[in-house]
Amino acid sequence: MKALTRHWFPIALIVVVLIVTLLIWKPWGDRFEPLPILWEAAQFELEGTSGETVSLSEHDGKVRLVYFFFSHCPDICIPTTAMLSKVQDELKSRDLFADKTMMYSITFDPERDTRERLLRFSEGYQADASGWKFLRGTEEGVKNLAQQYKVSVIKDQTGNFIHQNLFSLVDQEGNVRKVYSAGDPDVVASGDLIKQMADDMERLAR
């Protein structure tokens, strides 16, 4: 009994140290938990800014980020595209851009978003076409495609589009692994989502 009493303090100290260590490292453990497969990503073949056909499947083997927008958007699309430009920079700094990852910005509005318009728009955000494609299709086709990525969209009487501001993370095998919401301007402005998306893309790409 005396021996047990004599050793209880160092034993208790070890237990406390272990608990504190687990608490400190838990966020890192959560960070590296596997991302679940949510659903199979919808395939597409759309027109790029040079008139080329771009498909999701041609970039199998790369981690992909899919975003729906339109360049005449009066609010959230503009800061979100600026945010994607920073994601591009982050991926480049990690040697992931183009070789291991791709980003697609797909317009709801092919009537106004011509190839020339999309090219000028993309240049305004220093988009590197080797790893960030601005794409267009038919209005109805893109609407249906967006819905398959769980993005709802409604065309209003002014010709603008009311839509959810979501990103879909697609893995190398064509599975959607995560959906990010950027509907809150504060979230877009904070910079936290930029790092989160880049971190998740790196996790899948490595």
Task: Set out the residue ranges of the language-model regions.
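N-terminal targeting signals for export/organelle localization
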Residues: 1-47, 204-206
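Short loop/turn microsegments at loop-to-beta-strand junctions
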Residues: 41-42, 63-64, 164-166
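A short beta-strand-turn-helix
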Residues: 44-64
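Short active-site neighborhood of thiol/selenol oxidoreductases, capturing the structured segment around
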Residues: 57-84
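Structural microenvironment flanking redox-active thiols in thiol-disulfide oxidoreductases
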Residues: 81-145
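Structural micro-motif
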Residues: 132, 143, 147-156, 160-168
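Thiol-/selenol-based redox modules, centered on thioredoxin-like
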Residues: 156-206
